[in-house]
Amino acid sequence: MRLLSTLLFLVAATCPLIHATLSKTDSKKAASKAPETKTRLSDTLVQTRGLVSTDVKAKDIVLEHRSYCAKKLKERHVSADVLGYVTPWNGHGYDIAKTFAAKFTLISPVWLQIKRKGKEAYHITGLHDVDQGWIKDIRKTSKSTQIVPRILFDGWSYQDFESVFSSEDEIEELAGAMVQTAKDERFDGFVVEVWSQLGGQKRQELVHLLTHIGEALRLAKLRFILVIPPALAPGTDHLGMFGRKEFDQLAPVVDSFSLMTYDYSSPQRPGPNSPITWVQACIQLLDPESKWRKKILLGLHFYGMDYSALGASGEPILGNRYIEILKEHKPKLLWDQQIAEHYLEYKKNKGGKHAVFFPTLKSIQVRLDLAEELGTGISIWELGQGLDYFYDLL
């Protein structure tokens, strides 16, 4: 309990300070000439070019963001597992995965859903999104990179879950459908997302189900990655819906835990995407004795949030939109040491003041350093959302 109290104090002491980031000072309009962007790739890494800094300027991001090091695409800077998610609606993510495949140990295309069709009957959908040519390209670029599609328990009713929880035969059929699909499609395993669907209820029943799935996948020599919510609920001092007890129970049968240490703030409570003290607390609460740390994949976000002072609104933004904001408004980027994130402010003509939190090379590097210090891997949501030169850091 002493550890929990200490972690809660640290998070509470640092995170609320940034919630009032929309200052009264309007952004001043700079000269009309748009900043330039490099189109050529670089011979050196962003680390060598001095770009990983708290003192970063908008014009430098605009100039350099596409210029990753083409000569070191297979050079890794993270020794632990690195998982990258790819979604069908973001084609650039597919290209990024192919280009930087060697920097990832695991790539998870968000393709699949498992549906319950009746008693002991399961059907996996989304197979129309599977791109075997792309998988072949990934494996050609990096023989060690494993393809582990995410599978979502889609359209399940509470009664569906109850039926599975109460029947070993149901669990066996469900796990069997997953194993067969992996064999048919030549997948290396699955990322399973189900825990949050029951809102923290039926924890022991979920542990039982996932234990059986894990054992079936391991028997078939397939990887099992489980998506888990943060151990400390964002913006509160409450423990999350997946805690140390469940972690200890599942760690022996789960190969990796994809920990969602992002989405800390919201339009109703604008602020940082993943304050560093909160990220650290989420890991230490799950595994205070570092027994299974290498199985935790610290979640990194490659998207940002644009908050408006009008009506407590906000929306996610991707790299292209972020660059547009930098070009149009030429804002000053501010570094907050307590949360280890950059943010900026700008003003629309009739839209009021905005604050933008978007990852930078420095904020990503700080989290990579934390992962190394704590002995974890990382998972990235999602490839293609951020800026191309981010991948030099991996």
UniProtKB/Swiss-Prot annotation:
Highest taxon, organism lineage: Eukaryota
GO terms of molecular function: chitin binding
SMART domains: Glyco_18
GH18 domain residues: 80-394
GO cellular component, as recorded: extracellular region; lysosome
Subcellular location(s) of the protein: Secreted; Lysosome
Tagged with keyword S-adenosyl-L-methionine: no
Signal peptide residues on this chain, from the entry's feature table: 1-20
PANTHER family xrefs: CHITINASE DOMAIN-CONTAINING PROTEIN 1, CHITINASE DOMAIN-CONTAINING PROTEIN 1 FAMILY MEMBER
Family: Belongs to the glycosyl hydrolase 18 family.
Record-given protein name: Chitinase domain-containing protein 1
Gene name, Swiss-Prot/TrEMBL: chid1
